[in-house]
């Protein structure tokens, strides 16, 4: 389970492995993050310029392993006669930088997904469901915005890179995955955690989450526990923290 609305449906200092990808590829500052929203403008161009220069057939001579293996998941829009678990599809797992880019450049952009569908990147072995043993005691930080006129695809890429580069969590133990929910009229990007009670750690993850997305102080992200979301059903789960 991943979405209550569907009724079932700073710098890197102090963070482990913060330069995992940038040190090894030395292509561009993938994890550089603005402090305010207005600073986003230059980032997509720099990022996409770097991406266009990366050709998996010619640029990579050797592979660069990630610290952990990750899995891409896709949640299909609701279909009559199918349970939620039947709509959730495990797409592919990867454990190197090169494998990730090959996958990311091949699949559809998040902005092109139909309403009520999701992309998720989770540590291998963890399903993007509230009921998964690694998620059931946790929760999520979520940022929600209207889809029209946004730079969703770039923001989602920043979030995925921060997740697989393991720069979101100062402990290296809390983050289980990241999710992009496409909904009618808006999208939501979220980072999931194993536990929901360590406020100090959660606050650090939340601040890093805002930094990666370049969210200004005028915008708010909210943290909710999966337990509360499961009880809320179609209603919105109560917010435990906000930044």
UniProtKB/Swiss-Prot annotation:
Cellular component GO terms held in the UniProt record: cytosol; eukaryotic translation initiation factor 4F complex
Chain segments annotated as coiled-coil in the UniProt record: none
Signal peptide: none
Alphabetic keyword roster: Initiation factor, Protein biosynthesis, RNA-binding, Translation regulation
InterPro entries: TIF_eIF4e-like (IPR023398), TIF_eIF_4E (IPR001040), TIF_eIF_4E_CS (IPR019770)
GO molecular function: RNA 7-methylguanosine cap binding; translation initiation factor activity
Gene Ontology BP terms: cytoplasmic translational initiation; nuclear-transcribed mRNA catabolic process, nonsense-mediated decay; regulation of translation; translational initiation
Top-level taxon in the UniProt lineage: Eukaryota
Oligomer status and interactors: eIF4F is a multi-subunit complex, the composition of which varies with external and internal environmental conditions. It is composed of at least eIF4A, eIF4E and eIF4G. eIF4E is also known to interact with other partners.
Role played: Recognizes and binds the 7-methylguanosine-containing mRNA cap during an early step in the initiation of protein synthesis and facilitates ribosome binding by inducing the unwinding of the mRNAs secondary structures.
PANTHER family to which the protein is assigned, alphabetical: EUKARYOTIC TRANSLATION INITIATION FACTOR 4E RELATED (PTHR11960), EUKARYOTIC TRANSLATION INITIATION FACTOR 4E1-RELATED (PTHR11960:SF8)
Family to which the UniProt record says this protein belongs: Belongs to the eukaryotic initiation factor 4E family.
This protein's name: Eukaryotic translation initiation factor 4E-2
Organism: Schizosaccharomyces pombe (strain 972 / ATCC 24843)
Lineage start: Eukaryota, Fungi, Dikarya, Ascomycota, Taphrinomycotina
Gene name, Swiss-Prot/TrEMBL: tif452
